[in-house]
Amino acid sequence: MLRLKITNEQRQRISKKYTDNAEAYQLYLKGRHYQLKDTPEDLRKSRQYFEQAIDADPNYALAYGGLSEYYGFMGYSGEISPKEAWPAMEAAALRAAQLDPELAAAHRELAAVSLIAKWDWVTAEKEIKRSIELDPNDAETHFTYSMLLRTMHRFDEALREAKRAEELDPLSPGWKSHTALVHYYARQFDAAEERYRQLTHSDPDLPGPHLGLYNIYSRTGKESEAVAELQKGLTLQGADELAAALPRVYASSGFHAAREFAVREQLKILTDASRQGYISPVAFATNYALLNDKDKAFKWLEKAFEEHTPGMLDLDLDPDYDNLRSDPRFRDLVRRMNLPQEASAVSPGVQLVEFEPDRAKTD
């Protein structure tokens, strides 16, 4: 899942080889080389090498572990559908754990399967704790644990694990972004803003921190700042036409109109992209929720529920769904996912800036 780094355990196991087959060993190393580049194209190359390593040595646990990580990353990022990703991820992780019960990465990936694909929170925590016991210095493992904890509304613990991932891999912006997101989901907007602002300075080419600031400002009444950050984020994403049009709509019609314009344009982009490949249903659901089109939002959320889309982990956390929280269908989804119903992601007194009802009509 997400960024992949070589840990102490992995260095030891690579040096140990775990196979007497020189060809399998070299193929595995090539797979790790491409996996660490962390782009979809390179990850696809890594899969080919891991599969070739397994062909050369069917009992090579490390190669199965690498293959499981590939499917986890591609499924989590939406490069391939959950239907394709999760069974393959689980099968590879189970085989790795069978071949080497003390391979920490195998337990981490089994935890990720339980978390993302099965919504089995108890098993996920059991497996992630076992992984940390075997290798306490893997940033990816602490990130995965933080994801589980934030899903459970255990925000203090989630932040502890997120910051541990940062300590272990301080150069990765991914862990810093995750820490900011935990603050945001906990409605700790000041802390989230500080984190995102730091990222705009340390990693200026990333769109995510600007979009994170947009989300914060749009919910705290800082309209001009929100538009500016959204424009920057869209530009970095390559949506130049939308980015250029946004300030004009804001100047002529105000913030609500500009925000609605951006959401509708995003829906057009998503619809076009879905004709070419897989797009997560959550992407549609969040935009329709922002438009206050509840029926369409729940239609896409039901599809996401059926697929076990990764974004469903944020269902009871994401402020984008605040328009839906009073609807019985929302609480029913939370119940069916076995999420903690006694907790509420919405803190009393938080002012939210949403669309006016008369602007919420959809085509």
Where in this protein do the model-derived segments appear?
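TPR/TPR-like (Sel1-like) alpha-helical repeat modules
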Residues: 227, 231-240, 302-309, 338-339
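Eukaryotic low-complexity, mixed-charge intrinsically disordered interaction/regulatory segments enriched
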Residues: 294, 298-317
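Acidic, proline/glycine-rich low-complexity intrinsically disordered segments
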Residues: 1-237, 318, 361
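TPR/TPR-like alpha-solenoid helical repeat scaffolds
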Residues: 243-256, 312-328
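Structured segments of extracytoplasmic/periplasmic soluble domains
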Residues: 1-5, 9, 49-52, 304-307, ...
